[in-house]
């Protein structure tokens, strides 16, 4: 099973890009020794955060701030220092950030369903927690690279989505990310805190887990269990899927870019239908899976 999951995780419909005001240079991904010497990753025990912390830990001093409410302690790289704490507690954040060059802020309520059931907690973590991170960065003199989301746009008016697309979020999650995204850019404009907001599209890869881990993981689990892949509707609805390793590269590029105070979309720029995705999953799992609408 792990072999099949790995095979799918390495399957990419297209190479990713980060589009915005001039774009990010993905060649500047830390391979040339330009990684920050000391970094803090909030939410570093989660899916994307643990991948990022693992890359940063190769060459530098990495701290992970995570309350482990949804993160996995075992996902934190051995070379990283785990600080168990919550971004809603300012003192925990500023202590963890002391002496770092960059704060990669990924800690968040990430489930749309959870945000609908508890919008107050979502706002506390995603908005107030982000302001705490920005204040800590202001105090210690660090850059902030913020994990925003394509959910800030709501249903897109045009494809591919550009960073200038009107923001009409349709969930408390999307609204909280839009508010935090605005705070991130406002802190650079108001306080000269260098910031970059990265608006992730649908991220997939190894280590993704949980009830809201995404359609790719759900399809793969059913394929490996010999069950039909259930597609809701006609299957022609589209998503932009981006591999977690490309998201890591975007974060590393954002840590060194001179073009701060702005936002970038992180995706492939290509829409994949759910029907196409079902075929990709079946091929990756090497099974003749039934697709049921």
Task: Label each residue range with its predicted role.
Residues 107-110, 148:
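Conserved NAD(P)H cofactor-binding loop of Rossmann-fold oxidoreductase domains
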Residues 83-84, 124:
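Conserved residues in the N-terminal Rossmann fold of short-chain dehydrogenase/reductase
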Residues 117-132, 143, 151-197, 202-204, ...:
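Catalytic helix-loop patch of NAD(P)-dependent Rossmann-fold dehydrogenases
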Residues 39-58:
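N-terminal Rossmann NAD(P)H-binding glycine-rich loop of SDR-like oxidoreductase domains
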Residues 84-101:
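Conserved Rossmann-fold cofactor-binding substructure of NAD(P)-dependent oxidoreductases
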């Amino acid at each position: 099973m792990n072999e099949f999951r790995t095979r799918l995780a390495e399957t990419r419909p297209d190479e990713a890009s980060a589009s915005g005001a001039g774009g990010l240079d993905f060649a500047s991904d830390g391979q040339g020794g330009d990684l920050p010497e000391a970094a803090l990753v909030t939410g570093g025990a989660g899916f994307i955060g643990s991948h990022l912390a693992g890359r940063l830990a190769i060459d530098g001093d990495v701290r992970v701030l995570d309350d482990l409410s949804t993160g996995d302690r075992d996902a934190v790289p051995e070379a990283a220092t785990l600080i168990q704490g919550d971004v809603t507690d300012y003192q925990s954040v500023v202590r963890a950030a002391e002496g770092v060059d960059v704060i990669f802020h990924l800690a968040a309520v990430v489930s749309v369903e959870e945000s609908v059931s508890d919008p107050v907690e979502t706002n506390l973590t995603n908005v107030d927690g982000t302001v705490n991170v920005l204040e800590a960065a202001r105090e210690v003199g660090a850059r902030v690279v913020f994990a925003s989301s394509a959910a800030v746009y709501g249903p897109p008016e045009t494809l591919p989505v550009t960073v200038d697309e009107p923001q009409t979020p349709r969930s408390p999650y999307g609204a909280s990310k839009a508010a935090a995204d605005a705070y991130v850019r406002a802190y650079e404009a108001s306080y000269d805190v260098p910031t970059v907001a990265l608006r992730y599209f649908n991220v997939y890869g190894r280590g993704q887990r949980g009830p809201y881990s995404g359609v790719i993981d759900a399809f793969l689990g059913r394929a490996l269990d010999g069950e039909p892949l259930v597609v809701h509707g006609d299957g022609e609805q589209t998503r932009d899927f981006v591999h977690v390793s490309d998201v890591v590269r975007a974060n590393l590029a954002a840590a060194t870019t001179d073009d701060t105070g702005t936002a970038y979309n992180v995706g492939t720029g290509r829409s994949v239908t759910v029907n196409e995705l079902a075929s990709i999953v079946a091929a990756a799992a090497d099974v003749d899976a039934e697709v049921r609408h």
